[in-house]
Structures are given as C-alpha cells and as structure tokens.
From Swiss-Prot:
Enzyme active site: D109 (proton acceptor)
The organism's taxonomic lineage, starting at the top: Bacteria, Bacillati, Bacillota, Bacilli, Bacillales
Name of this protein: Type III pantothenate kinase
Top-level lineage group: Bacteria
Organism, as annotated: Listeria monocytogenes serovar 1/2a (strain ATCC BAA-679 / EGD-e)
InterPro entries in the cross-refs: ATPase_NBD, Type_III_PanK
C-alpha cells in the first residue's frame, strides 16, 4: 500500500492506494504549527478507523505548497511509518516538459494535477483547481506544460469582501439560483457564485482561443462541484485528481515497494 499526502494551504488530503486503487481518503486542517506527533496521531486515528496499520504502508509521497509544515510532516513519516517520504519537487521524474520561465516556482500541486490529467484524460488539457487559489493550467497536445493562470480562490474573495466592506456581513458560500438577489446576503451569494462561474468560463474560453486548440477541461478541488454544476465549460469533474497524480508519480519514481 502507498500513502499519498497533499498538503494544501487550507486542508491536507490523505489517501491510501493499493494496486493503483484508492482505498481510503481523509481530510485534515492544514496547521503549520502542528507537531510531528500531532500529525502522526491524526493519521493513525484515520488508520485505526479504517482497520489499517502503519506496517501496511510500503511507500509515502508528499506534495506540499506549505513549506513550514514539511519538517513535521517528514518527521512524522519516519517516526510513525519508518519510511522516508518521496517529496514532489525539483529532481522528481514527472514526464512533463515545463515550458515556463522558472520551472522551480510552479506549485507542486499544479505539477501533480497536470501529470494526472495528462495521463488520465489525454492532451491537450486544461486543469482547473478550485482551492485556496483558483488555478488554471494548460498542457498542450505534445504534453508540454505551457503555464496557466492563478486567481484568488472563492474563500479568499468572500473573506476579503467581509473584511474590507464595513456593512457587509460574512456569508456562507452557496449555489445561487437567482442572479438578482433580494437581500444583502442573497446579493452577495449571487455575486460570489456567478462571479466565479463567469471567471471560470471566461478564462477557459480565452485559453482555448489563445492556444488555438480544443482541450478537454478537467476540474478538481474542494469547491469544484458547486461551480461545475452550473458551468458547461468544464467537461470532467475529478475530485481525486491530485491523489491520482501522487500515486502515479510514486510509481514513476519508485517502481519497487521497498521501504
């Protein structure tokens, strides 16, 4: 079995694979002050609930966009699983040709998603990840990662509206059936929801235009389902795209299952 860990700005997603099949998955809050022991106890609780043991795990791979948590995360892997994890970063074999100004500055989550989408759905492909930031990545028909766009995420934008506009309340993010709100709350929810639907459709349309191609569009991330159910611009919703990419990268870099 392989343990895959995606450390995002808001949540960490943990998954267990066996023979390329996702058996279990969990989420926990990303807390850069959490110790290796706290991380270990959390993961072991997940395992206990699923009737798994640390000895079941033969390899670990981690993707992280939160550098401060990585020392604790790596220590946790060694202390509780007796495994030194494979870290997604410079030097790892991805199979992607990165045609960008500085390949080292591309977030590991974007690389992982690009690898998974290219393998699973073919190229050309656009990957949209609705996370803390909303990211758009374009991989051309030759499998070359051409770059993309990064926009503020839905949660960030909603909190900014509340924090910077004195008379506007904090609202829950929700799908709105009406673009014309009848109250402050419903107006904010309509603006947030339809604003991001429009942003998604607009950026995808412009990427298709500038690339002069007809890529398949794959969406992932915590809020992807809500947006994609309203938008016809997205072809495929894959909530486990990042975990798939991590498992694939593990196989490409560690074909054996030795500890």
């Amino acid at each position: 079995m392989i343990l895959v860990i995606d450390v995002g700005n808001t949540n960490c997603t943990v998954g267990v694979y066996e023979k390329q099949k996702l058996l279990k998955h969990w989420r926990m809050t990303t807390d850069r002050h959490r110790t290796s022991d706290e991380l270990g106890m959390t993961v072991l609780n997940f395992f206990s609930y699923a009737n798994l043991t640390p000895s079941d795990i033969q390899g670990i791979i981690i993707s992280s966009v939160v550098p401060p948590i990585m020392h604790a995360m790596e220590t946790m892997c060694v202390r509780y699983f007796n495994i030194r994890p494979l870290i997604v970063g410079p030097g790892i074999k991805t199979g992607l040709n990165l045609k960008v100004d500085n390949p080292r500055e591309i977030g590991s989550d974007r690389i992982v998603n690009a690898v998974a989408a290219s393998e699973e759905y073919g190229t050309p492909v656009i990957v949209v990840d609705f996370g803390t930031a909303t990211t758009f990545c374009y991989i051309d028909e030759s499998g070359v990662y051409q770059g993309g766009a990064i926009a503020p995420g839905i949660m960030i934008s909603t909190e900014a509206l509340y924090n910077r506009a004195a008379k506007l309340p904090r609202v829950d993010i929700a799908e709105s059936s009406q673009i014309i709100g009848k109250s402050t709350v419903s107006s904010m929810q309509a603006g947030i929801f339809y604003g991001f639907v429009g942003q998604c459709e607009g950026i995808i349309a412009e990427m298709k235009k500038q690339s002069n191609a007809s890529p398949v569009v794959v969406a992932t991330g915590g809020l992807a389902r809500m947006i994609t159910e309203k938008s016809s611009a997205v072809d495929i919703l894959d909530p486990f795209l990042t975990l798939k990419g991590l498992e694939l990268l593990y196989r490409r870099n560690k074909p054996t299952t030795e500890k």
